């Protein structure tokens, strides 16, 4: 199969006063059939293009339609429109699911949400507040956000190694809540 077989359709997903850039990728062999949908949400520094190659092509080859988007603070929304990342991802996903339900090829009883990288942290929160999500895939890439940021903050932000060592307390505090 070539990557070109999965035709993409650009979408503008309404979100408040703006629209989120997105793409609908139909399932291979089922581009005109109602099928389950996987909504893919990327990470902090990810883009729709990354998600297409890392996730949507494989989903399409396995019979799933895919909906990719850049949310606030991600990809084009960050780099071209200057929007900030927001923690209440359930608000973002509600708008994306509202949009997906209007697509004629989507089996609205079988909508999954997949989060990758930082999206792997945002997706569970979003799914917990969105009853129309029937399945969740969380792939955060890190067991601990603090572990991933220690070297970064020392190297790029001038934080002392001793102070960076305390970042683990952040994970502990979050887990106690």
Functional labels for PLM-detected ranges:
Residues 1-36:
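N-terminal cap/lid segment of alpha/beta-hydrolase-fold proteins
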Residues 30-35, 40-78:
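Short substrate-entry loop that stabilizes the transition state in hydrolases
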Residues 52, 73-90, 116:
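Accessory, usually C-terminal, subdomains that scaffold auxiliary metal cofactors
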Residues 59, 126-127:
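Aromatic pocket-lining residues of Rossmann-like dinucleotide-binding sites
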Residues 70, 110-112, 135-137:
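Residue in the alpha/beta-hydrolase core beta-strand immediately N-terminal to the catalytic nucleophile
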Residues 83-109, 125:
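Alpha/beta-hydrolase active-site loop
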Residues 115-119, 123:
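Gly/Ala-rich beta-loop-alpha elbow adjacent to hydrolase catalytic centers
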Residues 128-177:
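Hydrolase active-site cap/lid region
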């Amino acid at each position: 199969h070539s990557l070109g077989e999965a035709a993409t359709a650009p979408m503008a997903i309404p979100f408040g006063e703006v629209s989120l850039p997105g793409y609908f990728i139909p399932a291979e062999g089922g581009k005109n059939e109602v099928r389950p949908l996987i909504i893919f949400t990327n990470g902090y520094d990810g883009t729709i293009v990354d998600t297409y190659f890392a996730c949507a092509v494989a989903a399409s080859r396995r019979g799933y339609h895919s909906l990719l988007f850049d949310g606030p603070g991600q990809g084009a929304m960050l780099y071209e429109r200057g929007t900030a990342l927001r923690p209440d991802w359930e608000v973002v996903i509600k708008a994306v699911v509202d949009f997906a339900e209007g697509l004629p090829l989507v089996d609205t009883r079988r909508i999954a949400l997949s989060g990758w990288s930082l999206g792997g942290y945002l997706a569970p929160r979003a799914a917990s507040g969105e009853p129309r999500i029937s399945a969740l895939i969380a792939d955060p890439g890190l067991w601990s956000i603090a572990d991933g940021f220690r070297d970064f903050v020392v190297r790029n932000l001038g934080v002392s190694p001793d102070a960076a060592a305390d970042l683990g307390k952040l994970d502990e505090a979050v887990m106690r809540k």
